[in-house]
Amino acid sequence: MAIRIRISGTLLLSFLFFSTLHAFYLPGVAPRDFQKGDPLYVKVNKLSSTKTQLPYDFYYLNYCKPPKILNTGENLGEVLRGDRIENSVYTFEMLEDQPCRVGCRVRVDAESAKNFREKIDYEYRANMILDNLPVAVLRQRKDGIQSTTYEHGYRVGFKGSYEGSKEKKYFIHNHLSFRVMYHRDQESESSRIVGFEVTPNSVLHEYKEWDENNPQLTTCNKDTKNLIQSNTVPQEVEEGKEIVFTYDVAFKESVIKWASRWDTYLLMNDDQIHWFSIINSLMIVLFLSGMVAMIMMRTLYKDISNYNQLETQDEAQEETGWKLVHGDVFRTPMNSGLLCVYVGTGVQIFGMTLVTMIFALLGFLSPSNRGGLTTAMVLLWVFMGIFAGYSSSRLHKMFKGNEWKRITLKTAFMFPGILFAIFFVLNTLIWGERSSGAIPFSTMFALVCLWFGISVPLVFIGSYLGHKKPAIEDPVKTNKIPRQVPEQPWYMKPGFSILIGGILPFGAVFIELFFILTSIWLNQFYYIFGFLFIVFLILIVTCAEITIVLCYFQLCSEDYNWCWRAYLTSGSSSLYLFLYSVFYFFTKLEISKLVSGVLYFGYMIIISYSFFVLTGSIGFYACLWFVRKIYSSVKID
């Protein structure tokens, strides 16, 4: 029986380890089988640009519109991401190639020309969806071996000049060559879509006479199967001129199975960098672990052993270091209520982050589940309110406070209130740009309802449960008169030690942070939650150990004001995170619009502030455990 349990445990650990390397992919929707001739409806999504970070509705530009535009019901995460999924004029028949289809003919007025030129200037990309697969442009890149990568969406157009002229003109991609890859089931003869690619072209279409019911183009004719040539005259964006939008579609059988169809989108060519990041972080952890072990095993246990013999050896006068402040180390810190609020909020963020990563590792938050990650984070934040209330109330009672209701109110409203205020200002700026990224009033109202209707009551429930629990007893008594803190050496003064303490936690995550920022601001998929989960565990250990080490040095300097110092020591890593985001902005992004820059730094302030609360709470709890551990092992009259 013992052998069976040991084998099962080994298998479980092996499963968890390998699952952390690359997260499982569980499809967001059930597979759909298509027969030959079945209609396929292409949906359009937002227009996006890495140069502005301001998404727009697809029909913001004067594209072909269906008779009635139908909006697909987006989930909360999709709305927050700025997705606007709608129907389109692009329709296919399964397994039937269509060499040339006319979408529509539009006349370009002054406003349309201005919008097209603006979107081309900022390199906007149009996004489409077929059977829950985003359209992509195939790219070949050489990195030792030939590899295929996808670029999400296609460019609205490009700038260029005619031969013999230096004047820059604007050209629009008005002809789309789609390629649909499918995998055929040999038994049922049905097919499943496993790929959706597009090659955009700019073509100045010509025709003799326009027939709305059956337009015949001399440059692209479905009857003669004319093909678009690479040397075709491009379609210029000119006010008062017309643009004919066309498309063709070809179907190609693929060996890729439906369950693996997202692999090309999620292809990662930089696993070695992630492994380097993890090894680098583990070296930091081993270094800190060695220091903590040395403190705990060689110094503390020896000191405690010697200190416990002071009664018989009559050496009480020789007390030095951390032992001298035993009567003050559990003294209630200044602004203890605010500390309780921040620690409780940190527990809430920690719970949300941990559960979100577990769901992501199991594949429930894959990119095919569009908006699922954002939705999960919002909902988990709401329901983790009960742990925030419980933690802040328990800590407040340990500090011998008697205003638990006020602490509960601050826990429920302070942190989310600050975030909501920043978010509201940013949303107002987005509204001013007429971007689809602006959160509609209905969604804003839903967020407020989640906050006031679920999160706040749960915070109060958790706080009530924590208040009813008996107070955590201090292992030693606190003196009535505070001990004077001696003058500290320069390297132990709060400002210096706090800033030093944040370097190592940031160093443990900064490489992974690069990929996260690239995913957020350069519209790339991030699906390496296995690596991220390992880095998150390393971050927890690093925050805990660096705070313990610096706390011990602080106590040895007879400075017993450790509570806020512990929180700020690990929390200061958020300062380095924000400074890195500034560096990333100026070196990796090409944002030129003022509003876009404000949005970037506004969101990075939110992320850095959340990181501060998370890491600060980890450091505080680690220090609390450490201090209680060492002082509970000492005999004190």
Swiss-Prot record:
Residues 24-274, 366-370, 433-444, 517-527, 587-593 are lumenal. A motif (Golgi retention signal) lies at residues 635-637. The keyword Transmembrane helix applies. A motif (Endoplasmic reticulum export signal) lies at residues 626-631. Residues 1-23 form the signal peptide. Coiled coil: none annotated. Its main location: membrane. Residues 296-344, 392-411, 466-495, 549-565, 615-637 are cytoplasmic. The chain crosses the membrane at residues 275-295, 345-365, 371-391, 412-432, 445-465, 496-516, 528-548, 566-586, 594-614. Pfam families: EMP70 (PF02990). Keywords: Endosome, Golgi apparatus, Membrane, Signal, Transmembrane, Transmembrane helix. Ubiquitous but weakly expressed in flowers and stems. InterPro entries: EMP70, MFS_trans_sf. GO terms for cellular component: endosome; endosome membrane; Golgi apparatus; Golgi membrane; Golgi trans cisterna; trans-Golgi network. It is found in: Endosome membrane; Golgi apparatus membrane. It comes from the Eukaryota. It is a multi-pass membrane protein. The C-terminal KXD/E motif functions as a Golgi retention signal, certainly through the binding to the COP1 coatomer. Belongs to the nonaspanin (TM9SF) (TC 9.A.2) family. This is Transmembrane 9 superfamily member 6. It comes from Arabidopsis thaliana (Mouse-ear cress).
